[in-house]
Amino acid sequence: MQQYLDLMRHVLEHGHDKADRTGTGTRSVFGYQMRFDLAAGFPLVTTKKCHLRSIIHELLWFLSGDTNIRYLKENGVSIWDEWADENGDLGPVYGYQWRSWPAPDGRHIDQISQLLDMIKKNPDSRRLIVSAWNPALVDQMALPPCHSLFQFYVANGRLSCQLYQRSADIFLGVPFNIASYALLTMMVAQVCGLQPGDFVHTLGDAHLYSNHLEQARLQLTRDPRPLPTMKLNPEVKDLFAFTFDDFALEGYDPHPHIKAQVAV
């Protein structure tokens, strides 16, 4: 995945050193875009090993509408532990906004179900959008959404997705985000009778934390390897019926893991 290495190199060479909420410090740029053709392989970073199990379970958790980390803990996923309260709750984060956005009249809007219906009935619509950024509830969220809005686009039987990510932790977060939204695009394409197209990843504040700079430089010394292939169970036609066992990654041969600390 040369696109990801190019992003890291660009930030190292052209980024601005800035303070941040966590007190760690970052090197960042504003505005950057990557594009991945999903027909060319599943975009899972190969220059270090990524924990696909966490990516899949987190996505299924988002799609379920859940905002408590209990499901994640039961499946050995700890990526949200630092932000949960003593009961495991995170407030009205991604799952709530995706599946139960509160309307002023008291209704709750299931953005994902509406999206699927619109793709099937009006694939040329320019309104195939899901937003997790709800200004009225941001202060109640344990962590305001970093990947805040995504849009789908249908052309020639192919489904493409563009994500706008307001805040992008390049070393730890972005590899997860690329794989997660690529997988979501494949899942939505399957249940809508389409082929996966491109995943376009647009970043706002794209940053390397100051305690990730050496790890990034190490990763840049490694050559990308061929992308793996992601196989979905073709029998699944309901987006909300996917389970962990419906996914099979083939041909993933990454370089060794590179350890780095999460900035909380």
Curated annotation (Swiss-Prot):
Active site: 146 (nucleophile)
Domain of life where this protein originates: Bacteria
Predominant cellular place of this UniProt entry's protein: cytoplasm
GO cellular component: cytosol
Molecular-function GO terms, alphabetical: thymidylate synthase activity
Pathway: Pyrimidine metabolism; dTTP biosynthesis
Positions of dUMP binding: 21, 126-127, 166-169, 177, 207-209
E.C. numbers: 2.1.1.45
Purpose of the protein: Catalyzes the reductive methylation of 2'-deoxyuridine-5'-monophosphate (dUMP) to 2'-deoxythymidine-5'-monophosphate (dTMP) while utilizing 5,10-methylenetetrahydrofolate (mTHF) as the methyl donor and reductant in the reaction, yielding dihydrofolate (DHF) as a by-product. This enzymatic reaction provides an intracellular de novo source of dTMP, an essential precursor for DNA biosynthesis.
InterPro entries attached to this UniProt entry: Thymidate_synth/dCMP_Mease, Thymidate_synth/dCMP_Mease_dom, Thymidate_synth/dCMP_Mease_sf, Thymidylate_synthase, Thymidylate_synthase_AS
This protein's UniProt keywords: Cytoplasm, Methyltransferase, Nucleotide biosynthesis, Transferase
Matching NCBIfam families: PRK01827.1-3, PRK01827.1-5, thym_sym
Lineage of source species: Bacteria, Pseudomonadati, Pseudomonadota, Betaproteobacteria, Neisseriales
Binding-site residues, (6R)-5,10-methylene-5,6,7,8-tetrahydrofolate: 51, 169, 263
One GO-annotated biological process of the protein: dTMP biosynthetic process
Organism field: Chromobacterium violaceum (strain ATCC 12472 / DSM 30191 / JCM 1249 / CCUG 213 / NBRC 12614 / NCIMB 9131 / NCTC 9757 / MK)
Assembly: Homodimer.
HAMAP family assigned to the protein according to its UniProt record, in alphabetical order: Thymidy_synth_bact (MF_00008)
Keyword Glycosyltransferase: no
Catalytic reaction equation(s): dUMP + (6R)-5,10-methylene-5,6,7,8-tetrahydrofolate = 7,8-dihydrofolate + dTMP
Compartment(s) where it occurs, according to its Swiss-Prot or TrEMBL record: Cytoplasm
Family: Belongs to the thymidylate synthase family. Bacterial-type ThyA subfamily.
Membrane spanning stretches: none
Protein name: Thymidylate synthase
